[in-house]
C-alpha cells in the first residue's frame, strides 16, 4: 500500500496549529495514511520537551501505509490497531510504557472515509467503482452492506435510508431494493447503484441520492454514530487538563453529535431556572477553542474537493 493512495489530509494546518500547544502525548484516533500524524509530529519536533504520537486505526492496510510515512520519526510514533472508540483501552499500556509520565495533550478524530478505501473496489464503499457490497472499515467486521441490503425488512431499510441518509425517498428506494433482491441477491456496489438509479425520481439527482443511500449503509455497517459518541466520551476522559480535542466531521449527523457534546462540556449546570445559586451545580469541564466550525478555504477545496464539506471543531479541557 503506497502512501500516494491516501488523500491529502483535510484542514491539516488549521487542525494541527489549533491542537498542538505543549509537549505530551498526542493521539490521532483516525490514523488513515498518516497525513495528519505527519504534520503533528513535525509540530511536536519544534517544541522543547518529550512528546509521543499515538496513531489508531482499525484498518491494517492504513497502519501499513502510515508506518511507511512516519518511519523517519522512529519511536516517537506508536501505531495501534483498533477502533477509535477503544481509545481508553488502547492508551492504557502506552501510559504504563513509553508514555509513562507524559500528559495527554491532544486528540484528533477525522471522521471521513479515506480516499484509499473509497477508491479500492474490493472495499465496496463507492457506487462509482463496481466491487463487493462490503463497506466495512474493519475488514474483519461481522456485518457487510450486502447483509443489510439482502436481509433487512423493507420498513427497516426505509427507516435506515431516512435516518442515516436523510433521504426523502427512502421508502420508495427500500421497496425497489426488496423487489430486486426477490429476483436475485444484490451483492455488488454496481448492482445496488443500478437499483437506486431506477428508483430515483426523475427530478432528483441520482448522484446525490446514491451518496445518501451509500452513506446510510456505511453508517449502519460500522455503527459510526454509536462509535463516535463512545469515542467522544472516552476521548475527553483520557485528556489531561489543558489538553485539546479536535474533531473533523463531514455531514450533519456527525456534526450535530460533536457540536452537542462539545457544547455540553463547555456549559456549567446552574440547575432549574430561578434557583438562587452562587456557584453552579456542576462547573463547565472545557472551553471552546473554535466558536464556530472551521472550514476549508477555496484554495484547499480546489486541491482537495473532499474538504468542501469538512467542519473542524476544537475544545480545551479545563
Curated annotation (Swiss-Prot):
Subcellular location: Cytoplasm
Pfam families (UniProt xref): Methyltransf_5
InterPro entries: RsmH, SAM-dep_MeTrfase_MraW_recog, SAM-dependent_MTases_sf
Subcellular location, principal: cytoplasm
Catalytic activity: cytidine(1402) in 16S rRNA + S-adenosyl-L-methionine = N(4)-methylcytidine(1402) in 16S rRNA + S-adenosyl-L-homocysteine + H(+)
Keyword terms of this UniProt record: Cytoplasm, Methyltransferase, rRNA processing, S-adenosyl-L-methionine, Transferase
One of the record's GO molecular function terms: rRNA (cytosine-N4-)-methyltransferase activity
Tree of life domain: Bacteria
Residues reported in the UniProt entry to bind S-adenosyl-L-methionine: 34-36, 57, 91, 110, 117
Keyword Translocase: no
PANTHER family reported for this sequence: 12S RRNA N4-METHYLCYTIDINE METHYLTRANSFERASE, S-ADENOSYL-METHYLTRANSFERASE MRAW
Family: Belongs to the methyltransferase superfamily. RsmH family.
Function as written in the Swiss-Prot or TrEMBL entry: Specifically methylates the N4 position of cytidine in position 1402 (C1402) of 16S rRNA.
Name under which the protein is recorded: Ribosomal RNA small subunit methyltransferase H
